[in-house]
């Protein structure tokens, strides 16, 4: 029977992939500093460098929070163990090819005297790995030798047990992913490790104690996770937990012992849960039921420690987590629910342990506590967000939203906003593009969540469902970035510095790299890892008028020993797992920006064009270029030699100063006089604390000297313009940033760029026309009321005082949101004029299509932005055929009322529907439940806009009839 199940494949896919700035926690352990794919040896998504901000994979971004709770591993690792330099062996490293050449005796002797990470391609599937692991005799030799060493290890010598277990874990990891090794993925084969595990456990030195003993205990748990367990192996493990509990005050600050008991709990839980899913059995039908009470009781002791400290909080959380999951194997099957309910009442409301308990009751016990009371996770999560993130700030007409803790100052938020503008300006200059590659994605609105502290950031796991063993995390699927405020004692980096890095990742996803993170060929095999991380470190050095400069803090990460520095080849092919590559990837891109801009530009052009083949070839050629590597090394030495001359860019106080009023007309006049532009256009934007402007136009330069020289000339010119503006009387010019895009050469052989300026707007007293939103187009039936909406119409410097609708059939209305009935079929032009309190008017037009008979959906309507607008009491026909998997509809509810939604599945295909309210596009307001061929639900609707997704989940084709009443 296969050890891993279908659901575990999902669990593997939701492992977080690190994509972002360095955080400020303990150094990554030796175990973590390995090629990133090695960290997925457990299909549970927990083993990754804690110092990296994560950017999660496709599955985690797609699954709902509730689904992630069910399939993901939400246990919490203890703090990382400080890295210790490995003892140098006879040979620095070995490959699987080297191991294949050895006879059995040579193999076991070698494995016994090296560290597992000296095997360079362990956990990587290649022909050598396949040959090695398909040799059943060799596998048995390793298992037998592990048993021998397990029975003979001492408190001072672990006999290389960790290396043997890692080689076996690599076998099962590769077998899970590759059918060529499928025999190793059978539990019957993995059970062959049980005698070795028992030999280890029967050794009197199998206990927590010295570092060697702790290493063996950890290896025991990890091997169970990837191989298998039985009753006896679990019973032996209970002795380890009891020893830890009995010596809790002594052991709680010992990271190796913490890691060891975590590996024991996680490994056994993972194996047993996997068995349930694969065998399709209930807990009371398994060998463990009623026979591992001792192990579970020790976990329960951890769950109910009562006194939570920063040092033991991770342990308490894990105790609650595993007590819930394993409680059903206790001789008292309600024990898990009893313990988790006790924990919920024991720990402070809305604390981390409290949330873990609530989640487990929701996930494993249908939302009912031990007394039968309903536990409403959604309501509690909402309370948590209100407590930990009570403040909201909006900028740029709502396109940037900050949600923060109450201790994150308003000044800090303003500085971060202006820092984003400096980074954005330099970023667009370099890539030459400022148009979203895929407009309509969630990142049309960037949401930035900032907790008060690293401690409160841990609640992000409970409030939003994402990993917190990082310095922050950007979820491209939702356009949301999570991080926390920090003190100088907690970090050598400021929040602004880290924010600049992460904001660059947002820009990359929106303007540079096609598709969502992790999807598509360009993301495969970590092609972009070196580029995206180094790129973010590079642009964190953006300035207003001095281009992009190296940061002193990142230079400090380069080795003082030239022999220890990365080569260009190693940098270009760097992968997650080592922290150093961030620094060297920055240095390479800084070098290219400064000395080989054409090369830098070509790399980005290939990425933006999604040209995987030529990107691979170009990267390969660069990696073999000795001149590039030589100059790269010299550039790094130059940075190190001049490190004290650099600083860390941060926004100036000028951004926060009070600036005198000045009309935007006058601003535009002065700016276009300083930099002559054709077709200049001034636009005002609204933010919570202030308004801003963008001034766009086309600049024509001198006769072209080639794109690279033209770019340098333009960058110099724009910087000079910014400096000239800053010398003028109005201080607001010191907030202006600028970029230029869309390079071309005109018919006169002169280069041209589109230039965009951004700065503070202080045009107080100048009346602006209102914004009108007609919310069309509309559809309806003859002699049935059609609801027209003016939602979104606004006047930023006053209020709208009148509305005038012209329905195109000779009739009008002055209502804000009128209902109109058409007498004849046809297409009508509808106009809406709004007037503000100072007399200015704005007009917008749309169409309404009126049909005699039933309505039919209009494609495309696959996304919320394309949704077909329907009214209440509407029936509409639709189809899901071929690649058309989803139809989206939208309707408005003016006041609270009960709504019936029904979809008639006319062909019996696999389909359903879900409904979201505009205020929460992540969680369902309602969802369809099958009733024969109807998929229906009734719910009480609050006022607002709703989005209804009708979708199929198989390959069937069919039509349906949707009714909303």
Curated annotation (Swiss-Prot):
Its EC number is 3.4.24.3. It is found in: Secreted. Zn(2+) binds at residues 501, 505, 533. Residues 1-30 form the signal peptide. It holds the Pfam family ColG_sub. Residues 653-765 are annotated as: Helper subdomain. Residues 853-965 are annotated as: Collagen-binding domain. GO terms for cellular component: extracellular region. Residues 769-850 form the PKD domain. Its cofactor is Ca(2+); Zn(2+). Residues 845-859 have a biased composition (Polar residues). Residues 31-93 form a propeptide. GO terms for biological process: proteolysis. Residues 94-366 are annotated as: Activator domain. Keywords: Calcium, Hydrolase, Metal-binding, Metalloprotease, Protease, Secreted, Signal, Virulence, Zinc, Zymogen. Residues 94-765 are annotated as: S1 metalloprotease domain. It catalyses: Digestion of native collagen in the triple helical region at Xaa-|-Gly bonds. With synthetic peptides, a preference is shown for Gly at P3 and P1', Pro and Ala at P2 and P2', and hydroxyproline, Ala or Arg at P3'. Residues 376-645 are annotated as: Catalytic subdomain. Residues 842-867 are annotated as: Disordered. The keyword Chloroplast does not apply. GO terms for molecular function: metalloendopeptidase activity; zinc ion binding. Acts as a true collagenase, which is highly active and cleaves natively folded collagen. In vitro, can also cleave gelatin and the synthetic peptide FALGPA (furylacryloyl-Leu-Gly-Pro-Ala). Causes damage on dermal collagen (COL), resulting in gaps in the tissue, which might lead to an accelerated bacterial infiltration and penetration into deeper sites of the host. Belongs to the peptidase M9B family. Collagenase subfamily. This is Collagenase ColQ1. It comes from Bacillus cereus (strain Q1). The lineage of its organism: Bacteria, Bacillati, Bacillota, Bacilli, Bacillales.
């Amino acid at each position: 029977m296969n050890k891993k199940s279908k659901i575990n494949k999902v669990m593997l896919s939701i492992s977080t992939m690190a994509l972002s700035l360095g955080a400020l926690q303990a150094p990554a352990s030796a175990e973590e500093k390995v090629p990133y794919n090695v960290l997925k040896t457990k299909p549970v998504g927990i083993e990754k460098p804690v110092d990296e901000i994560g950017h999660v994979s496709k599955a985690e971004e797609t699954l709902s929070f509730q689904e992630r709770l069910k399939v993901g591993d939400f246990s919490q690792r203890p703090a990382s163990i400080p890295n210790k330099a490995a003892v140098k062996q006879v040979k620095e490293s070995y490959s699987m090819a080297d191991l294949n050449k050895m006879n059995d005796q040579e193999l076991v002797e070698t494995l016994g005297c090296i560290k597992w990470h000296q095997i360079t391609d362990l956990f990587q599937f290649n022909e050598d790995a396949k040959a090695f692991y398909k040799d059943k005799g060799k596998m048995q030799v390793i298992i037998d030798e592990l048993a021998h060493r397990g029975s003979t290890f001492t408190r001072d010598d672990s006999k290389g047990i960790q290396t043997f277990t890692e080689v076996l874990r690599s076998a099962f990891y590769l077998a899970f992913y590759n059918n060529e090794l499928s025999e190793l993925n059978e539990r019957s084969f993995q059970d062959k490790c049980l005698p070795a595990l028992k030999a280890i456990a029967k050794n009197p030195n199998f206990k927590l104690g010295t570092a060697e003993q702790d290493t063996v205990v950890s290896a025991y748990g990890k091997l169970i996770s990837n191989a298998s367990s039985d009753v006896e192996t679990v019973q032996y493990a209970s002795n380890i937990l009891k020893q830890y509990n009995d010596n809790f005050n002594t052991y709680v600050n010992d990271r190796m012992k913490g890691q060891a008991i975590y590996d024991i709990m996680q490994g056994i839980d993972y194996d047993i849960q996997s068995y349930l899913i694969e065998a399709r059995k209930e807990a009371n039908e398994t060998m463990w039921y009623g026979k591992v009470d001792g192990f579970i009781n020790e976990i329960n002791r951890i769950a109910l420690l009562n006194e939570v400290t920063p040092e033991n909080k991770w342990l308490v959380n894990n105790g609650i987590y595993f007590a819930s999951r394993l409680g059903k194997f206790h001789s008292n099957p309600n024990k898990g629910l009893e313990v988790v309910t006790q924990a919920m009442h024991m720990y402070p409301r809305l604390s981390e342990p409290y949330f873990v308990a609530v989640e487990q009751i929701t996930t494993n016990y249908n939302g009912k506590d031990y007394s039968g009371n309903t536990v409403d996770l959604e309501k509690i999560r909402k309370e948590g967000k209100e407590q930990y993130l009570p403040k909201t700030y909006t900028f740029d007409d709502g396109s940037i939203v900050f949600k923060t803790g109450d201790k994150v100052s308003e000044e800090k938020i303003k500085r971060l906003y202006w820092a984003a503008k400096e980074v954005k300006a330099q970023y667009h200059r370099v890539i030459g593009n400022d148009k979203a590659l895929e407009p309509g994605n969630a990142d049309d609105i960037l949401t930035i969540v900032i907790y008060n502290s690293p401690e409160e950031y841990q609640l992000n796991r409970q409030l939003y469902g994402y990993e917190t063993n990082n310095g922050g995390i950007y979820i491209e699927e939702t356009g949301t970035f999570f991080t926390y405020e920090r003190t100088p004692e907690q970090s050598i980096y400021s929040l602004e510095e880290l924010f600049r890095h992460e904001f660059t990742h947002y820009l990359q996803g929106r303007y540079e790299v096609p598709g969502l993170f992790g999807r598509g060929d360009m993301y495969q095999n970590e092609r972009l890892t070196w580029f995206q991380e180094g790129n973010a470190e590079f642009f964190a050095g953006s300035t207003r008028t001095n281009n992009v400069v190296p940061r002193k803090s990142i230079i400090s990460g380069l080795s003082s020993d030239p022999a220890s520095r990365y080569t260009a080849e190693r940098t270009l092919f760097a992968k997650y797992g080592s922290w150093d590559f961030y620094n060297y990837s920055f240095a390479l891109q800084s070098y290219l920006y400064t000395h080989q801009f054409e090369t830098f530009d070509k790399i980005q052009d290939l990425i933006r064009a999604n040209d995987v083949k030529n990107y691979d070839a170009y990267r390969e050629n660069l990696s073999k270029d000795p001149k590039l590597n030589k100059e790269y090394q010299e550039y790094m030495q130059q940075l190190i030699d001049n490190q004290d001359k650099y600083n860390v860019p941060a926004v100036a106080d000028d951004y926060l100063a009070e600036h005198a009023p000045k009309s935007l007309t006058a601003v535009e006049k002065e700016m276009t006089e300083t930099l002559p532009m054709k077709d200049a256009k001034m636009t005002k934007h609204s933010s919570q604390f202030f308004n801003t402007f963008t001034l766009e136009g086309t600049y024509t330069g001198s006769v072209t000297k080639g794109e690279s020289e033209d770019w340098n000339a333009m960058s110099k010119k724009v910087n000079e313009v910014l400096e000239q503006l800053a010398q003028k009387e109005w201080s607001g010019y010191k907030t202006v940033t600028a970029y230029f895009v869309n390079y071309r050469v005109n018919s006169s052989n002169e280069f041209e760029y589109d230039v965009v300026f951004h700065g503070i707007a202080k045009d107080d007293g100048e009346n602006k026309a209102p914004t009108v939103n007609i919310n069309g187009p509309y559809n309806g039936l003859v002699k049935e009321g059609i609801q027209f909406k003016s939602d979104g119409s606004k006047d930023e410097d006053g209020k709208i005082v009148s509305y005038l609708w012209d329905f195109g059939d000779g009739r009008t209305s002055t209502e804000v949101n009128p209902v109109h009935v058409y007498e004849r079929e046809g297409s009508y032009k509808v106009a809406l004029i709004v007037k503000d309190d100072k007399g200015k008017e704005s007009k917008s037009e749309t169409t309404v299509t009126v049909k005699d008979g039933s309505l039919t959906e209009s494609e495309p309507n696959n996304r919320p932005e394309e949704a077909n607008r329907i009214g209440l009491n509407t029936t509409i026909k639709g189809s899901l055929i071929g690649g058309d998997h989803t139809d989206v509809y939208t309707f408005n509810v003016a006041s609270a009322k009960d709504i019936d939604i029904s979809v008639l599945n006319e062909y019996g295909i696999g389909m359903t529907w879900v409904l979201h309210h505009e205020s929460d596009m992540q969680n369902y307001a309602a969802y369809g439940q099958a009733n024969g061929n109807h998929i229906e639900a009734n719910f009480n609707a609050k006022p607002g806009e709703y989005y209804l997704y009708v979708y199929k989940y198989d390959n069937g084709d069919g039509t349906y009839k949707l009714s909303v009443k």
